[in-house]
From Swiss-Prot:
It comes from Francisella tularensis subsp. tularensis (strain SCHU S4 / Schu 4). GO terms for biological process: DNA-templated transcription. Pfam families: RNA_pol_Rpb1_1 (PF04997), RNA_pol_Rpb1_2 (PF00623), RNA_pol_Rpb1_3 (PF04983), RNA_pol_Rpb1_4 (PF05000), RNA_pol_Rpb1_5 (PF04998). PANTHER family: DNA-DIRECTED RNA POLYMERASE, DNA-DIRECTED RNA POLYMERASE SUBUNIT BETA. Keywords: DNA-directed RNA polymerase, Magnesium, Metal-binding, Nucleotidyltransferase, Transcription, Transferase, Zinc. Its EC number is 2.7.7.6. Mg(2+) binds at residues 458, 460, 462. Transmembrane segments: none annotated. This is DNA-directed RNA polymerase subunit beta'. Binds 1 Mg(2+) ion per subunit. Binds 2 Zn(2+) ions per subunit. SUPFAM superfamilies: beta and beta-prime subunits of DNA dependent RNA-polymerase. It catalyses: RNA(n) + a ribonucleoside 5'-triphosphate = RNA(n+1) + diphosphate. Belongs to the RNA polymerase beta' chain family.
């Protein structure tokens, strides 16, 4: 890197990679244009920079363009001359942004990043603790650099006294010194190769894991130094580079003061101390003073590089810490995130938005003033081309005066020139869309109501920004890709996002309602026109039931056409809507009461059958109709619309009576405090539900008299209609308005037991108001926290997935995931049809008869998934991003359908970012609160049996049963399920069956709706014996491991097992029930968990299926279930839960009770020959779910607890793990009613599995047990396979999204995410190369990103490069793709020898540049 760096043209095409490494003193000097010797900045009288100071013009270049400091040389003609008076080179002033200087340090100084950024690189390299290195550096201790023949050891620390003593004893036979010089000498003296050999030997021989790990770390570091060409002594600086002055400016402000960058202060401290040290050394000052000065110099450089990293931060005059070089690049305000990833853009404006109900979907209203400002350059050029102005200056004046012709020209300029509208926060790609502007008066931007959902905008003062795409390419992209009419479907779920809401829904609902006995009822009309005429003349009512003759053509999704003919029963309103229904859609879609869901269905159907264009037109027409009729309906909220039910008071009195009884029971100690609270909560929630129900009854029905006869009809109450249609409000809100408010939650989620009996119409008393403030405030606080958290989750997701792009058509794998319907609580929540839509099959789908229904590789569309459903297929194998074999990207087949476009995804689509946005965007809707089970949150009555909801057959899965003496079948397995399938064999229900349940029917039996297929005790889990024999109680000692309780009322005795923590002695006793035969041989032993209540006495006789003990379920209930946003973050961060379930690491037999320690119990897993394969130590408080002698398979649960995703992946495999994350994440979103396609979650999971751990290094350079990018292992294996060597064996490792982002191959991407210092430190030592593959890296260096149209451009230029290389073409020759070559198109007079042109071109370019610079552009 020489001075040429400054004069080269920064052409972004010229480099393919960026490398970061340590700079040697020679390199730093080669960057520099001179040494900065003085701390002065500028002369305060003349405002000229001081010579040799921090702003010296001689070093850094002139202050004014092409003018030396003393003014002897001015103008362009002297370019390149160095003035002999002031020594300044005549050059452009902008070189002051790029020319660096340097400071020669009198003594070496350690770079703080390599010292303090953990793990300390210098400490690790020298194999010294950080504390010791610091002692040497900051002149507290001496370090022996060369022990000579003395008994001292190398790197031994000596205090001043010890050093003096050693000098006395050994004289100058040894060398010891302090400060950075000593460290530098030690670093330089290290023989890296021999150290590496020693460490490799140590790794192989060492028995202790800790030693081995440390050796591996050190070995890695030494190897990187060896491989990267960095010298370790470069971590200690002898020359300090000085930043160009224009990057640390000093600006005069009024009042004769200066605003300066903190860096100048920091540099001045360094220079001052450096100069003082130089003087002290020249004067031969006493050692202690020199030492102190050296320490201060070290501290000054530390502060410059990273202020506050060590000791107290250096503060400026205003007591705040100075901003060092490290602070400049890190954090949200740092260089990476503020200036490189997010730049401000020109040609943009922002204003408040208002509603534009008369716009078409692809239009937006743009205020005239704003448009004129935005399109100024276009207007100028049109004014000149049209001959209205001769110069730009004149055009400028015309625009300023706003002459009439300007507006006409603006109209033509704006025509078909799309603009981008953006609303912050832009949470997903639909937050920026393109519209065609329509000029409007006023100052607010008008927005089409249907795109509000995508922008999440409303008109209560929201602002939006407008951006103008300038180039033809960008206009084309805006029109084709970003136009609102091309973004009908949401990329997250594939459902329409432009569905009508609020007023529109209300209007459509209102006119499609029917009313008994309305004017004109029963009339027959022959066409829409007749109805319209009759309605307009006032002879029929809009809600009247009529008959209408129709004759339409209808298309279905398979492309068939059929006729819809005949007379239909309908209403006037629905007939009026017939006019806007396009040809091809059935009238039956409209011929019903249109609530929000139904309107969505119409739009969905239109898109599937008629395509985008017709859908957009339909949506617009529906919107106009909705607005028109909601205005005409006159629906509004009045206080009388809130009907309070008559029986409210009675219900409340009844509840208060019950509560009084319960309180009395509590006072006479019949029930516990907990029971009292739960009962009261139950009473109030039941009462408020009942009051709500009778309020709904009153509000939803009206009594009218038709022909003197009274009739009940559905009400036209405004509040009811708003809620019923889905326009605004909900049942719950109506209940609070006119029923009773009910129970309020405290901030911790528990309910306050005094319910609010009033409603908002009656008004709340002061006390009631106070009670309700609790929950309301929690809501507000939550919302504020939630938004920040959701934003941060999105950022982490985007960062981990940003470089995942579809880069090829097909990777050719037949791997995939098994998909079946998602079943929760026995109900099918997501049918297979929905999950399979838009996926590619990984294996043939075969019917029960063995017929291949669909072949592998088929992309499933709507018609094909219906085919699956019709044939009763309930499980298929689909390709998935997780199992895709494409490296550094994805293939289109594994991803499947692009949800927003309804066809296979294009190569170049950045699916990673789309996935991150789809998961992050609904994050703000997810609740923050953790759901509490128990108390009022789970008000459901406890379930104790299962009734079938569909007729069909039942099938047992993993169920073992025994028959007890009453002849009942008792379930003795833990994770059993009963599956109910219909007559076609499709799974319709799936129920988990607890241990101890009674199953009346056998597997394979037919069932009808309502049949009970299992019953159990909901309050306790029984321990059941599957052998008969005599009971022997072991370690059940009254007062130590168990406690006897005697109930006075019932006279019952119970024995309950106490917990280990309650015992004072005998902590290693383990209560067990053993069952023995007549000879006393043990048949079975059942360990008793804490809280178990014994059902048997010692020596009693048991039959098969008898209950040995019961564990009350109150105690073993789950802890709080984390819900909402924290749960999603927990899943993607792959956090290990506390007290996670312990899974069996291998197959074998469980052996318990051997060699238990004081605190821990030992589980041994033995193979067939009785050898111990695995041992697991667990705290004694953990409850085991396996018995001694039980056979287990790899991945079976040994001790229960929440699932640990890491163990799941390790022991159960990729598919189980993927399934777990998918189902868990989806259940959180489903709870909030958010639809997200599975493939987005799979895409993120793929990025969490980027690394693998080496099990066997084979013939590679890798080391066993280190974790490496999977791609690198696969590439290495390819090489080894070709050479016929032994391949690497590895196992996938799970990483959370934050760790995964930080350990990406690209250091630019990682550094701009988090922990910038650590990432750059590591990268520079490794001399890391960034291949600029991802999106982020390319944004940083200002290139087109390699995705979408950018990928096409990149591929094209790569092709051209390759052709150039093959043909040996020079850079300045131009050629095009010859396939599109047409000789007739060439005009021969334009062709000249390029060589001659080159010189002329340069001259023209030169004069042009100067001309432009003289103009004030």
């Amino acid at each position: 890197m020489n001075n040429g760096i400054l004069h080269q043209n920064y052409n972004s095409k010229k480099f393919d990679i960026i490398k970061i490494s340590l700079a040697s003193p020679e390199v730093i000097r080669s960057w520099s244009h001179g040494e900065v010797k003085k701390p002065e900045t500028i002369n305060y009288r003349t405002f000229k920079p001081e010579r040799d100071g921090l702003f010296c013009a001689k070093i850094f270049g002139p202050i004014k363009d092409y003018e030396c400091l003393c003014g002897k040389y001015k103008r362009l003609k002297h370019r390149g001359v160095v003035c002999e008076r002031c020594g300044v080179e005549v050059e452009q002033a902008k070189v002051r942004r790029e020319r660096m200087g340097h400071i020669d340090l009198v003594c070496p100084v350690v770079h703080i990043w390599y010292l303090k950024s953990l793990p300390s690189r210098i400490g690790l390299f020298l194999d010294m603790p950080l504390k010791n290195v610091e002692k040497v550096l900051y002149f507290e201790s001496y370090i022996v650099t060369d022990p000579g023949m003395t008994p001292l050891e190398k790197k031994q620390l000596l205090t001043d006294e010890e050093y003096a003593e050693a000098l006395e004893n050994y004289g100058y036979e040894f060398e010891a010194s302090m400060g950075a010089e000593a460290i530098r000498d030690l670093l330089a003296d290290t023989d890296i190769e021999s150290e590496i050999e020693l460490l490799q030997a140590e790794c192989e021989e060492s028995k202790s894991t800790a030693k081995k790990e440390k050796a591996i770390k050190r070995l890695r570091l030494l190897e990187t130094f060896q491989a990267s060409g960095n010298k370790p002594e470069w971590m200690v600086m002898t020359v300090l580079p000085v930043l160009p002055p224009d990057l640390r400016p000093l600006v005069p402000i009024e009042g004769g003061r200066f605003a300066t960058s903190d860096l100048n202060d920091l540099y001045r401290r360094v220079i001052n101390r450096n100069n003082r040290l130089k003087k002290l050394l020249d004067l031969n000052a006493p050692d202690i003073i020199v030492r102190n000065e050296k320490r201060m110099l070290q501290e000054a450089v530390d502060a410059l590089l990273d202020n506050g990293r060590r000791g107290r931060a250096v503060t400026g005059s205003n007591k705040r810490p100075l901003k060092s070089l490290a602070d400049m690049i890190k954090g949200k305000q740092g260089r990476f995130r503020q200036n490189l990833l997010g730049k401000r853009v020109d040609y943009s404006g922002r204003s408040v938005i208002t509603v534009g109900p008369s716009l078409r979907l692809h239009e937006c209203g743009l205020p005239k003033k704003m448009a004129l400002e935005l399109f100024k350059p276009f207007v100028y050029s049109k004014l000149r081309l049209g001959g209205h102005a001769t110069t730009i200056k004149q055009a400028k004046r015309m625009v300023e005066l706003e002459e009439a012709v300007v507006w006409d020209i603006l109209e033509t300029v704006i025509n078909e020139h799309p603009v981008l509208l953006n609303r912050a926060p832009t949470l997903h790609r639909l937050g920026i869309q393109a519209f065609e502007p329509r000029l409007i008066e006023g100052k607010a931007i008008q927005l089409h109501p249907l795109v509000c959902a995508a922008f999440n905008a409303d008109f209560d003062g929201d602002q939006m920004a407008v951006h103008v795409p300038l180039t033809v390419e960008s206009q084309l992209e805006a029109r084709v890709l970003m136009m609102s009419t091309n973004n009908i479907l949401s990329p997250a779920s594939g459902q329409p996002i432009i569905t009508p809401t609020q007023d529109i829904v209300l209007g459509l609902y209102y006119i499609t309602r029917e009313k008994e006995g309305a004017r004109g009822e029963g009339k027959l009309f022959s066409s829409y026109e007749d109805v319209s005429r009759a309605y307009n003349s006032g002879t029929i009512d809009i809600h009247a039931k009529i008959k209408l003759r129709i004759d339409r053509q209808v298309f279905d999704t398979k492309g068939n056409t059929y006729n819809e003919k005949g007379v239909v029963n309908t209403t006037v309103g629905r007939a009026l809507l017939l006019n806007i229904l396009p040809e091809g859609l059935s009238f039956s879609l409209l011929n019903k009461v249109l609530v929000k869901k139904e309107i969505s269905k119409i739009i969905n159907q239109a898109f599937r059958v008629l395509g985008g264009k017709a859908t957009v037109v339909l949506a617009d027409k529906l919107m106009y109709a909705g607005f028109k009729y909601s205005t005409l309906s006159g629906v509004s909220v009045g206080v009388d619309d809130m009907t309070i039910p008559d029986n409210k008071e009675a219900k409340i009195e009844e509840a208060e009576k019950e509560i009084k009884q319960i309180t009395e029971q509590y006072q006479s100690s019949l029930i516990t405090e907990n029971e009292r609270y739960n009962n009261i909560i139950n009473i109030w929630s039941k009462t408020s539900d009942e009051v709500g129900a009778s309020m709904m009854d009153a509000i939803s029905k009206d009594t009218v008299s038709i022909n003197g006869e009274k009739k009940e009809i559905e009400s036209f109450n405004s509040v009811y209609m708003m809620a019923k249609s889905g326009a605004r409000g909900s049942y719950n809100q109506m209940r609070q308005l006119a029923g009773m408010r009910g129970l309020m939650a405290k901030p911790d989620g528990t309910m306050i037991e005094t319910a609010i009996t009033a409603n908002f119409r009656e008004g709340l008393s002061v006390l009631q108001y106070f009670t309700s403030t609790h929950g309301a405030r929690k809501g507000l606080a939550d919302t504020a926290l939630k938004t920040a958290n959701a934003g941060y989750l999105t950022r982490r997701l985007v960062d981990v997935a940003q470089d995942l792009v579809v880069i090829e058509e097909d990777c050719g794998t037949d791997d995939g995931l098994m998909f079946s319907a998602i079943v929760e609580d026995g109900e099918v929540k997501v049918p297979l049809v929905e999950r399979a839509l838009g996926r590619t099959l990984a294996a043939d789908v075969v019917t029960e008869k063995g017929v291949v229904l669909l072949e592998a590789g088929t992309l499933l569309d709507e018609n094909l998934v219906e085919l699956l459903d019709d044939n009763g297929i309930d499980m298929i194998k689909v390709r998935s991003p997780i199992t895709c074999k494409t490296r550094r990207g994805l293939c289109a087949k594994c991803y499947g359908r692009d949800l927003a476009r309804e066809r296979q995804v294009n190569v170049g689509e950045s699916v990673g970012v789309i996935a991150a946005q789809s998961i992050g965007e609904p994050g703000t809707q997810l609740t923050m609160r953790t759901f509490h089970t128990g108390g009022a949150a789970s008000l459901g009555i406890t379930v104790s049996d299962i009734k079938v909801k569909t007729a069909g057959k039942i099938k047992f899965k993993n169920i073992r049963t025994v028959t007890n003496k009453e002849g009942q079948e008792i379930v003795i397995s833990r994770a059993g399920e009963i599956i109910v399938s219909d007559t076609m064999g499709r799974v319709r229900e799936q129920h988990k069956i607890p241990m101890g349940a009674v199953v009346p029917l056998a597997s394979g039996k037919a069932v009808e709706i309502g049949d009970v297929i299992a019953t159990w005790d909901p309050h306790a889990q029984p321990l059941i014996t599957d052998v008969a024999g005599k009971v022997v109680l072991e370690d059940v000692i009254d007062g130590i491991t168990s406690k006897h309780t005697y109930d006075d009322l019932t006279g019952q005795q119970t024995i309950e097992i106490t917990s280990i923590s309650q015992r004072t002695t005998s902590k290693n006793l383990k209560p067990v029930v053993k069952i023995v035969d007549e000879k006393g041989a043990e048949l079975k032993s059942i360990p008793l968990a804490v809280g178990a209540v014994l059902n048997v006495a010692d020596d009693s006789i048991l039959e098969v299926g008898d209950i040995v003990a019961k564990i009350p379920l109150e105690g073993s209930k789950n802890k709080d279930i984390t819900g909402g946003l924290p749960r999603v973050a927990e899943l993607f961060e792959a956090r290990r839960p506390k007290d996670a379930a312990i899974l069996s690491p291998c197959d074998g037999m469980v052996r318990l009770g051997n060699r238990d320690t004081k605190e821990k119990q030992r589980i041994e897993i033995i193979d067939k020959n009785g050898h111990i394969v695995e041992e697991i130590l667990l705290p004694k408080s953990r409850h085991l779910v396996v018995f001694d002698g039980e056979q287990v398979s790899r991945g079976d649960v040994l001790a229960d607890g929440p699932t640990d995703p890491h163990d799941l992946l390790k022991y159960k495999g990729l598919e189980e793990f993927a399934d777990y994350i998918l189902i868990e994440a989806q259940s959180v979103y489903r709870m909030q009613g958010v639809v997200i396609n599975d493939k987005h979650i799979e895409t993120i999971v793929r990025q969490m599995l980027r690394k693998a751990v080496i099990l066997d290094e084979g013939d590679s350079k890798f080391v066993k047990d280190e974790s490496i990018e999977l791609v690198r292992i696969l590439e290495e294996n390819d090489k080894l396979r070709k050479q016929g060597k032994k391949e690497v064996e590895y196992e996938l490792v799970l990483m959370g999204i934050t760790r995964s982002s930080l350990s990406t191959e690209s250091f630019l991407s990682a550094a701009s995410f988090q922990e910038t210092t650590r990432v750059l430190t590591e990268a520079s030592i490794n001399s890391q190369i960034d291949n600029l593959r991802g999106l982020k890296e390319n944004v940083l260096i200002g290139r087109l990103i390699p995705t979408g149209t950018g990928l096409a451009v990149r591929k094209e230029s790569a092709k051209i490069e390759k052709m150039r290389e093959e043909l040996g073409v020079e850079d300045n020759m131009v050629f095009t793709d010859l396939s599109s070559f047409n000789p007739e198109e060439i005009s021969f007079d334009s062709i000249q020898s390029q060589k001659e042109d080159k010189d002329i071109n340069e001259d023209i370019e030169e004069s042009l540049r100067n001309a432009l610079e003289s103009l004030d552009f």
